[in-house]
Swiss-Prot record:
Binds 3 Mg(2+) or Mn(2+) ions per subunit. Involved in the biosynthesis of over 15 sesquiterpenes (C15). The major products are (+)-alpha-barbatene (27.3%), (+)-thujopsene (17.8%) and (+)-beta-chamigrene (9.9%). Can use farnesyl diphosphate or geranyl diphosphate as substrates, but not geranylgeranyl diphosphate. Its cofactor is Mg(2+); Mn(2+). A motif (DDXXD motif) lies at residues 310-314. Expressed exclusively in flowers. Expressed in intrafloral nectaries and in the funiculus within the ovules. Mg(2+) 1 binds at residues 310, 314. This is Alpha-barbatene synthase. The gene is BS. Mg(2+) 2 binds at residues 310, 314.
Length: 557
């Protein structure tokens, strides 16, 4: 693709200059040889059979052995190792769940029950939350004696976040655990440092809402300070994460080289967002495993294009210009590009360039059918971009529900999930894309959740720009409430949506677990992006911390 042409700065109004990328080209400096991967991979393969034998080779009729296996599966998940043992985990949990009543009949430890609950719900088994009733006293409240069990309280708090719309006991548990965990983390009753840190991490973002790469890195630091940790398991976790880091550095180098070759930065006007590292981080949220390295690269490139398109339409395009771009994308024909001018023409060329890359990759995989699905999802983004631009500038005021429905598509929710399924390789079959395009409840909820969280985070900035297409703004106008009242209501909606996501993942039986996990991982990405601040757009703070944790802080063997 040729270098981008200069944009018309005269049309630049109401927008302030954004800072240039803090990362620059530093990832171009890394040089990783194939032998670096080979050395770590050999060490990993030596340890895997030992871990497998320690965890999964036990008596299938021994209740205590089954409990121990389930608790060990929790360690595998938390340490980022479960993808090495998927078959063993599946078989063990299937067998254990068939005997679930007998398994927990005499169990009265909060930590054990909470962890078993978490593991089964993680893997799609509906274990009833009634199991927690045994921890209530005669007054119907949770027993105060539970507070002394720090790890039990933490695991109970983590279990709460697997709740559905009917798990009312977990709503009670949330208040109970929150009230006490904060003092266990930092107050006068503070736990040992490594446990306090784990509690603080959970209070910021619980494991079920956090992305797997961050959970693994944080949990490795916790686990090695546990007196009863398994040395073999810990070593495997450390080697595995170092192996992941090599892939991550290689991917960042590839994406940075691709972006540099296109020469975007030298010609971009001041409000176009340069987000090479941020888009890679967003892709990492969808899958962290090494076998999906190409998928992360493909996803990061799509996010760069979506960001570029969003800036072109929201910031620089007049309604007529955005209409012309949407029309060209609808036709998907390069011959119509001559009808476009300046930045709209460049945006169209950028889209065509990326999808040509996709076409070549998918053809080599024998999966050309995916391209048609991806093109359709991208056309939807273009249509919804136009719709929101018209609402923001044309005077039409949509209802809150109408805006949320369109806004979820415009922000790229469906295209993001589709791209992540594309990156799964052979796992991403035609049926998965047809399921996504049918817009099941799970997917629609994720679109709405994205729109809500993004608009809550960016409300002040949107209003400063004069950009009125914002969920808070529409809710305030429709219901005649203050910003604070609207914020509380939207936060409540977001909490309810989390429960629906959990509920739908337990209900859906027609899709492979890995496909559903892409939806779960997408939901997790929203919490990571927006819990502290808008990580994608505000690069200081949490993003810097996350990148340091994932790529800079050493893991000592």
């Amino acid at each position: 693709m040729e270098a981008l042409g200069n944009f018309d700065y005269e049309s630049y109004t109401n927008f302030t200059k954004l800072p240039s990328s803090q990362w620059g080209d530093q990832f171009l400096k890394f040089s990783i040889a194939d032998s670096d991967f080979d050395v770590l991979e050999r060490e990993i393969e030596v340890l895997k059979p030992k871990v497998r034998e320690n965890i999964f080779v036990s008596s299938s009729t021994d209740k205590d052995a089954m409990k121990k296996t389930i608790l060990s599966i929790h360690f595998l998940d938390s340490l980022g190792l479960s993808y090495h043992f998927e078959k063993e985990i599946e078989e063990s949990l299937k067998h254990a769940f068939e005997k679930i009543e007998d398994l927990i009949a005499d169990e009265n430890k909060l930590h054990t029950i909470s962890t078993i609950f978490r593991v089964f719900r993680t893997y799609g088994y509906y274990m009833s939350s009634d199991v927690f009733k045994i921890f209530k006293g005669d007054d119907g409240k949770f027993k105060e004696s539970l507070i002394e069990d720090v790890k039990g309280m933490l695991s109970f708090y983590e279990a709460v976040h697997f709740g559905t719309t009917t798990d009312h006991i977990l709503d009670e548990a949330l208040s109970f655990t929150l009230n006490h965990l904060e003092s266990l983390a930092t107050g006068r009753r503070a736990s040992p440092p490594h446990i306090s840190k784990l509690i603080q991490n959970a209070l910021h973002i619980p494991q079920h809402r956090n992305i797997q790469a961050l959970v693994a890195r944080e949990y490795i630091s916790f686990y090695e300070h546990e007196e009863d940790h398994d040395e073999t398991l810990l070593k495997l976790a450390k080697l595995n994460f170092k192996f992941l880091q090599l892939h991550y550095f290689q991917e960042l180098k590839t994406i940075t080289m691709w972006w540099t070759k296109l020469d975007h930065t030298s010609n971009l006007p001041p409000n176009f967002r340069e987000r090479t590292v941020e888009t890679w981080f967003a892709a990492l949220m969808m899958y962290f495993e090494p076998q999906f390295s190409l998928g992360r690269i493909m996803s990061a490139k799509l996010y760069l294009v979506i960001t570029f398109l969003d800036d072109a339409c929201d910031t620089y395009g007049s309604i007529s210009e955005v209409e012309s771009l949407a029309d060209c994308l609808e036709r998907w024909d390069p011959d119509y590009m001559e009808n476009l001018q300046g930045h709209m023409k460049t945006a169209f060329k950028f889209v065509m360039y990326l999808f040509k890359e996709y076409e070549e990759i998918l053809r080599s995989q024998g999966r050309s059918f995916v391209l048609e699905k991806m093109i359709e999802e991208f056309k939807i983004i273009a249509r919804k971009n136009l719709e929101l631009v018209k609402w923001a500038r044309g005077g039409h005021v949509p209802s809150f529900d109408e805006y949320i429905e369109s806004g979820g598509a415009e922000i790229g929710t469906y295209a993001t999930i589709a791209c992540s399924i594309m990156g799964l390789g052979e796992i991403g079959k035609k049926e998965a894309f047809e399921w996504l395009i049918s817009r099941p409840k799970l997917v629609r909820i994720l679109g709405a959740k994205t729109r809500l969280m993004d608009d809550i985070a960016d409300f002040e900035e949107d209003m400063e720009k004069g950009y009125t297409a914002n969920a808070l703004n529409y809710y305030m106008n429709e219901h005649g409430v203050t910003k604070e009242e609207a914020s509380r209501e939207l936060e409540k909606m977001n909490g309810d949506m989390n429960k629906i996501v959990n509920e739908e993942c337990l209900k859906i039986t027609t899709m492979p677990r890995r496909i559903l996990m892409q939806s779960v991982n997408y939901a997790r990405s929203l919490d990571v992006l927006y819990t502290a601040d808008d990580v994608y757009n505000h690069r200081e703070g949490k993003l810097k911390e996350y990148m340091r944790l994932l790529l800079v802080d050493p893991i000592l063997l």
